[in-house]
Design a protein with these regions (language model features):
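N-terminal glycine/serine-rich phosphate-binding loop of ATP-dependent small-molecule kinases
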Residues: 2-115, 162, 223, 245, ...
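Active-site core segments that coordinate phosphate-bearing ligands/cofactors
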Residues: 9-17, 22-23, 89, 127-183, ...
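Conserved small-residue
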Residues: 33-35, 40, 95, 122, ...
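A generic structural motif
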Residues: 49-50, 120, 323
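Short glycine/proline- and acidic residue-enriched helix-loop micro-motifs
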Residues: 59, 133-137, 225
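Short beta-strand-loop/turn "lid" adjacent to the catalytic site in phosphate-handling enzymes
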Residues: 82-119, 139-141, 174-186, 190-195, ...
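Conserved beta-strand -> loop -> alpha-helix junction used to position metal-binding or nucleic-acid-contacting
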Residues: 117-127
Length: 537
């Protein structure tokens, strides 16, 4: 992926001359800072572990948690630079901040937080979401910022009249660093719907929302309190003296460093996997799964199963999210490991995964009739309310290890398949390639083949499968400074970041495609059994 490796003296010179780029991302359990050189290589990182709190019925992080975590992740990175290269960071080429999207942060005209920060995990916005979906004829998920704001209005919360600014976590940090009330279009698309032609909030929906709440007589209109939307490559302000001290309380970091538009974790993930071009997709397959498909044009119909966001440069993205992923698969692998230990077999977990996953490829294309569900949590897309892992078979089922493992790999992708079918079959969306990343793809070629057959599309897996969100954010910071006039983000990534790293590609196999379709027919029929288990068991 990266162009060339640097010597230690090269890196020291880059850092001292202020030519390194910094990306910091707030994940739900970890805040990570990644420093890269001019060739996009990560040269240092730092992190801070944190946890959300459940207070007064809401998931939140306190402002103290936010600032302590930011400073600690930066300090950890800076100390690693000092230890590794013997240099103190004073200047940087550019900085970018990213964070988990959505949620609710509302401030008054003095900059005071009016209500506790509500994270994306809060689902107390059902009524608001329902009203807004009906009003806009556009999917507004429970976690979106506009749903949180409208729920506060429905609940007659007193603070709403005093709102002067509402933003996301990344937008808040950026504002405190620069004084600029701006947001990258990808993160903004999780606050309020975006018009892909103007790369700004959808004007028709803005007017509909203002009309919806005009009887409340608030002293603001919705666009007045939302952040200004910027796209990747736009200048988004410079680090102020106050901002520098908030990031680095030691005082070593100097003011005046340019910042790029703050982004959401979905956007940085797309950058890190080289998946921002139209007709491309990336699928993350870990403890939960999600797929993101970059569209050429808006969808024809409203689909509540599909979330609409954008790339950092403003292309429309259809996102399918599955609450469940590899957890049930892992449980079965652990069970077989326990059996191996019980008979005295010396097998490590890598060998166990490799053996069982590869065994799945020996199974029948339709799993021999075995049906399984790996739901550890509820699944809105399939209307399953609770976690009920299940294996079902008939007396005629070909019950063997290969079919058993294959069924569990198949079902792990079941919800993603339902969502992708809406896009490709119902909406006619065309996808050239999918980039797969995450735990499902660690055993070479297995998860990749199953996914290619499931969605009938070529799947590429890179050796690194991307360096993660904070690295993607650092790339966006660098792109703002180093892009040529008119150079698109997708071209910058393709030609200057990822270069010749095309990864390994597996094309769908007609027999496998037909087998997966047969499995999905049974999967859909069996969902009533799964739903009944949520009630009776």
């Amino acid at each position: 992926m990266f162009r060339r490796k640097r010597t230690m003296s090269n890196v020291k010179e880059i850092i001292e001359s202020g030519k390194a780029y910094l990306g910091i991302e707030f994940g739900s359990t970890r805040i990570k800072a990644v420093l890269i050189d001019e060739e996009h290589n990560p040269i240092a990182s730092g992190s801070h572990t944190w946890e959300n709190r459940y207070e007064n019925g809401l998931w939140t992080y306190s402002l103290d948690d936010i600032w302590a975590g930011l400073q600690d992740s930066y300090r950890d990175m800076a100390e690693n630079v000092q230890k590794e290269y013997g240099v103190t960071i004073k200047k940087l080429g550019a900085i970018g901040f990213s964070a988990m999207m959505h949620g609710y942060m509302a401030f008054d005209k003095e900059g005071k937080l009016l209500a506790p920060f509500q994270t994306w995990r809060n689902s107390n916005t059902g009524k608001a979401s329902e009203v807004l979906v009906d009003l806009f004829q556009y999917n507004i998920p429970l976690r979106w910022s506009i749903a949180h704001l409208y729920q506060c209005i429905l609940d007659k919360e007193d603070h709403v009249k005093d709102i002067a600014f509402t933003t996301t976590l990344a937008g808040y940090i950026h504002w405190q660093m620069t004084g600029e009330k701006v947001l990258g279009v990808g993160d903004a698309s999780g606050m309020f719907p975006i018009d892909m032609n103007t790369k700004d909030y959808d004007e028709e929906m803005i007017q509909k929302f203002d009309k919806l709440i005009e009887g409340e007589n608030y002293p603001w209109k919705i666009k007045e309190i939302l952040p200004k939307v910027l796209v990747a490559g736009d200048a988004a302000g410079i680090l102020t003296e106050e901002g520098a001290k908030k990031l680095d309380p030691t005082g070593n970091l100097e003011a005046g460093i340019p910042l790029c538009p703050p982004e959401g974790d979905a956007g940085t993930g797309m950058v890190a996997t080289n998946s921002v071009a139209q007709r491309t997709s990336n699928i993350s397959a870990g403890t939960s799964f999600f797929s993101m498909v970059v569209l050429e044009k808006p969808l024809k119909d409203l689909h509540t199963e599909i979330d609409m966001v954008t790339t950092p440069d403003g292309s429309l993205v259809a996102m399918v999210h599955s609450n469940n992923g590899t957890t049930d698969l892992n449980a079965w692998v652990n069970l077989f490991k326990e059996f191996a230990d019980s008979i005295g077999a010396d097998v490590d977990m890598n060998q166990m995964y490799g053996t069982l996953y590869n065994k799945a490829l020996e199974g029948d294309a339709d799993c021999g009739g075995i049906l399984s569900y790996g739901n550890y949590a509820g699944e809105p897309i399939t209307n399953v309310e609770k976690g009920r892992p299940m294996v079902v078979r008939t007396p005629e089922t070909k019950f063997n290890l290969a079919n058993f493992m294959r069924s569990h790999l198949y079902t792990a992708l079941g919800v993603i398949k339902v969502g992708m079918d809406i896009l490709t079959k119902d909406e006619g969306v065309e996808i050239d390639t999918v980039l797969g990343h995450g735990g499902l793809f660690k055993t070479k070629g297995v998860g990749q083949k199953i996914l290619a057959d499931a969605i009938n599309t070529p799947v590429v897996v890179m050796e690194t499968a991307g360096e993660g969100g904070p690295w993607g954010m650092a790339i966006l910071a660098e792109y703002m400074v180093k892009r040529e006039e008119g150079e698109k983000l997708e071209d910058y990534l393709k030609n200057k970041v990822f270069g010749s790293d095309a990864g390994s590609r597996i094309d769908p196999d007609p027999e496998g495609v037909a087998g997966y379709e047969a499995f999905m027919e049974t999967y859909k029929k069996g969902l009533d059994v799964e739903r009944r288990a949520c009630v009776d068991l």
